[in-house]
Every structure is written in C-alpha cells, then in structure tokens.
C-alpha cells in the first residue's frame, strides 16, 4: 500500500499520556496529566540549551511517553501481585525493566532525530547509582532532562502547592545536585522556573495550553508500514492493561483491516480502520483491573463503570486534531443499531458502515480469542451468535454475512 495517512502524532501521544496517567494514578497515586507536566517541564528546561524544532518535538514525545511500558511491566513481572505489592515493586525493584521494555517499544514511533537510550536511561542518577549505573556524562541529555522533570512532578504531587511546595523542590534539587541530578540540569530547571509563580501553572493546569503553544501540533504523513507500527505501539499499551485481553486490540485491528480490504476499501480507509481498531479500547485504561478482571458477574454499578470505557475512548481521542472520523470508528464499537448500545445510544441512522464494521469485528474477536477464563469459540459458532444479534436488531446483517464469508477460510 503506497497511499499515506496524515496523523497528529504529538496529539496522539498526548492523548495516550492521559491513559498512562490513569494506570499511575491507580498504582502510585500520581495525579492526572503527569505525562504532560513532565513534557512541559522538559521543554521549558530545553530552552537553556536552545533546543528547538524537531529536537524539541522529539523531547516532548519522549517525555509524554516516558512510562509507555508501565502496563507491560506490571503484566509481565507482577502478574499475580496485589496493588500494594505493585507499589512496593515499582518504587524499589527492577526499575530498569520498564525502561528496557519502553526503549524497545518506542522504536516503533517515527522520531525525526536520534532518541536512542532516552527512555532506557530516564531513571539514571548523575553519580552512577541508578538502575544501569551510568554517570551523567554517559546519559543522553534528553534522558537527564526527563529524569529531573519526572522526579520534580512526583515530588510536587506529594507536597501540595504554594510556596512550601516550591521551597521543598528547590531544597531537594540543591541537596541532590551531582547525586541524583547533574548540575547542568538543575541549572536548566532554575533558568526555566525562577520563582514559585512561574511554577504555579503546573498546579492550575494552565500549563497545557502553554505546552501546545511551544510544541506545534503539525500532522505527519505516514506510509502504511509506519502507520501500522504506530497503531501497534499504542495497542500494545492497552492490551497489556489486562491479561484477560492480551491481544484483543491488535486482533481487532488486524481483522478490521483484513475485512475492509475484503469488501473493497481503498488503502487509506484500510489504514484508518486498522488504527481505529488498535485504539478502540484505550478507554479501558481508565477502568480498574478489579472490574476488568473480575471472575464473577459484574454488579450493575460495576457494569456501568465498565461501559464507561467507550466514552473514555471518545474523550481521550478527542484530544487529537482532525481525528474525528477515526475517533468515532473506534469509540462507537458498543453502539447498536436499535439504539440500545453505549456510550451514546446511537441508532441505525446515526451509524455509518465503518462504525458498524467495528462493532461486529469487536464481537467476533472477543468471542473467538482465548482468554484465561475461556477457550475461544469456533468461527461457525461465532457467526451464529452474530447472525442472531443481527436478527434482533443489534448489528448489521449484511456485515455479519460478509464476516462469515471473509473469515470462513482462515
């Protein structure tokens, strides 16, 4: 496929940083917008070195996604731990593992400059006492900047607001200069934030407008391979959230794209539907695992919270510029033709073909995939269920029939 798709990639990274914040809030009580605050502190510090253009945008991208492997780390290393044990492990052990995973994941993002080892070393200490025992002169500048920004935001989160918080941060930086942080980065921070008033925007959330003023939201043009890599990167973050759906987003993306090709969609729309499939469950990042992985039937209140995930998908993807079409394809996957779906209760007249496809493919993937608590159903049995849903007015009967044809020989 040679046709290319334009995407607001920095906006998509910003949207996903919110989803990552939901995980960190669940585990270590960090307030929302942590990723964006780290990005803002980082780009303000960057002025000290006169970093501009593509380098500045790539620094912001790395900062927004610095904890991109958090769900993967928890899933692979702490599978059976309680939240309390997760907190303990996240703060004291194996910090390097999420850095290793994150560094590998980030290679799928099309950066314009070299960001090698930025995510890998973003928890290193200037004096060599960090996870990889690298000293400040062995650590990429962007990693050093993000490490300080990340630490300062966590400290600020735990010390409240106002002059007391600012004074504590100043004392902490000076105390740990040449230990946790190199003097150059400490100087860069004080160059950017000269007094408590200059730091206050991080507490009243006015910083976000300033962040997007400094970092332009320019769309990038991606070929199919790059688009798929970007989609897979974000889908992986979502799928690692729960062991119950470990390949669900990727599976939906692959089947939706395959089906779209089968019924004659052009390459641009195949790419769009792949991306929508990869992103459709991003809202589940805002739903606790005690609900996502509950072995018993959900209570009415729990089911209501579970249903919120589709609304969160809509809300999160609304942050991305010129993304309304893909957002809707992704977020409406639980809508039903008879108006009994969610989050908006759309009716048949309000649901276009790609949105109907996503609803059917999501059901097909969920029923056919293996999960810890069940074996996946056969193609035939799944199609019988889809046909029954079509007869009852839930899903599109033509799409249900074509799914039977499309996947029957696989």
Model regions and ranges:
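Histidine- and acidic-residue-rich, metal-dependent catalytic cores
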Residues: 2-410
């Amino acid at each position: 496929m040679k046709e290319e798709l334009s995407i607001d990639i920095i906006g998509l990274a910003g949207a996903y940083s919110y989803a990552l914040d939901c995980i960190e809030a669940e585990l270590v009580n960090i307030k929302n917008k942590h990723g964006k605050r780290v990005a803002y502190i980082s780009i303000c510090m960057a002025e000290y070195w006169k970093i501009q253009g593509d380098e500045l945008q790539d620094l912001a991208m790395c900062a927004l996604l610095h904890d991109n492997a958090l769900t993967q780390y928890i899933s692979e290393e702490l599978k059976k731990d309680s939240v309390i044990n997760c907190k303990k492990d996240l703060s004291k052990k194996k910090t390097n593992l999420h850095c290793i995973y994150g560094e590998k994941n980030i290679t799928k993002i099309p950066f314009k400059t070299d960001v090698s080892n930025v995510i890998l070393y973003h928890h290193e200490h200037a004096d060599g006492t960090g996870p990889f025992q690298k000293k400040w002169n062995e650590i990429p500048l962007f990693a050093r900047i993000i490490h300080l920004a990340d630490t300062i935001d966590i400290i600020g989160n735990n010390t409240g607001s106002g002059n007391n918080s600012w004074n504590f941060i100043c004392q902490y930086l000076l105390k740990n200069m040449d230990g946790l942080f190199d003097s150059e980065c400490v100087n860069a921070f004080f160059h950017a934030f000269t007094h408590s008033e200059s730091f206050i925007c991080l507490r009243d959330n006015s910083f976000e407008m300033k962040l997007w003023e400094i970092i332009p939201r320019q769309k990038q043009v991606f070929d199919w391979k790059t688009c798929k890599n970007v989609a897979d990167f974000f889908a992986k973050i979502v799928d690692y959230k729960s062991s119950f759906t470990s390949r669900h987003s990727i599976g939906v993306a692959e089947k939706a794209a395959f089906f779209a090709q089968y019924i004659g969609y052009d390459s641009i729309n195949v790419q769009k539907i792949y991306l929508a499939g990869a992103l459709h469950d991003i809202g589940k990042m805002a739903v606790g695992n005690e609900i996502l992985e509950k072995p018993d039937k959900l209570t009415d209140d729990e089911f209501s919270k579970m249903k919120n995930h589709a609304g969160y998908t809509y809300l999160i993807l609304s942050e991305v510029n010129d993304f309304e079409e893909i957002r809707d394809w992704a977020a409406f996957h639980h809508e039903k033709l008879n108006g009994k779906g969610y989050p908006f209760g759309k009716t048949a007249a309000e649901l276009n073909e790609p949105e109907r496809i996503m609803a059917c493919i999501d059901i097909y993937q969920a029923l056919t995939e293996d999960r810890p608590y069940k074996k996946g159903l056969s193609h035939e049995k799944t199609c019988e269920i889809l046909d029954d849903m079509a007869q009852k007015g839930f899903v599109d009967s033509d799409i249900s029939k074509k799914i039977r044809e499309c996947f029957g020989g696989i």
